[in-house]
């Protein structure tokens, strides 16, 4: 079978059946090996086909060539030599139109940003955006008129059977593009106006880097805070004047304070900068801290001893005149300044002499800080003995 290869549309549908190459016309032999604008005719030797002893008469193909007026640059598909259809031409126009729209949007946004950066007011920006929108609408109407004229010309040329649907598609697309583009332009105008208004309000509210709103809101609070500071200073000076006689205050309020009060907090001072403390002061501070701890521990132990003493004194099975109960009673009197007048009994005198506590008259005791550890140990011993008696 001999096949003539040509363009995809014109020459592919012709074939030869049972062709004798000797009987091919001279025109085919002359054209063999020559090209028609890129299309080459080739020859292939195949066996002749017979049908029950009778040869089939050969057919001469139609001499079809490519039209010389076709411009290959106008064709959309590279492998096709046909003219572009009306839809393809309108599609190319629509692409050009969309490119113009996007280029217009980019120019408009750049110009508005530059005007905002230069400090243009909101009124000029609004006029500018309105003018740009009007220009864009004029351009869009001109382009739509151009599309309509192209559609009318294509209808008059005889290929208008396809155009109603294509024209409707293009008009709908243009309508949607117009709506979306106008919406985008309006949104850009709103954003520019908001940014310009925000910048002007910030410049009005603040001058020379000072925010007057913050000063107006914080100044009353600062004035309110300054008053308690002055009051605290007066209170501290008043307390210092009252606590000039440290010995007297320690005698009267040594055991009357609450047990939960953290007395050593006054000595836990935090200081960020490096501070050189003399060794004597440091050792004295440790000594005072230890003594305060002993006072706090003695106050807690006295409360527990008082509870155990009341339980043991309420029961008749134990001798109330025993040595343990007497010492516990003397320690409780020693811890309460209101009972200093009752320390003249034998048990109280024994404890005072044992721990070298001096009784000055009937109203005060001369306590030494060095005796607090011994008093704490004795209180713990009495508590253990009372627990044994109760159990």
From Swiss-Prot:
Keyword Transferase (UniProt): no
GO cellular component: cell cortex of cell tip; cell division site; cell tip; cytoplasm; cytosol; division septum; medial cortex
Keyword presence, Cell cycle: yes
Keywords attached to this entry: Cell cycle, Cell division
UniProt cross-references to InterPro entries, sorted A to Z: Etd1
Top-rank lineage group of the source organism: Eukaryota
Region (Disordered): 49-68
Signal peptide residue numbers: none
GO MF annotation list: GTPase activator activity
Single biological process term from Gene Ontology: positive regulation of septation initiation signaling
Pfam family, one: Etd1
Purpose of the protein: Involved in septation.
Identification of the protein by name: Septation protein etd1
Protein species of origin: Schizosaccharomyces pombe (strain 972 / ATCC 24843)
Species lineage: Eukaryota, Fungi, Dikarya, Ascomycota, Taphrinomycotina
Name of the gene encoding the protein in the UniProt record: etd1
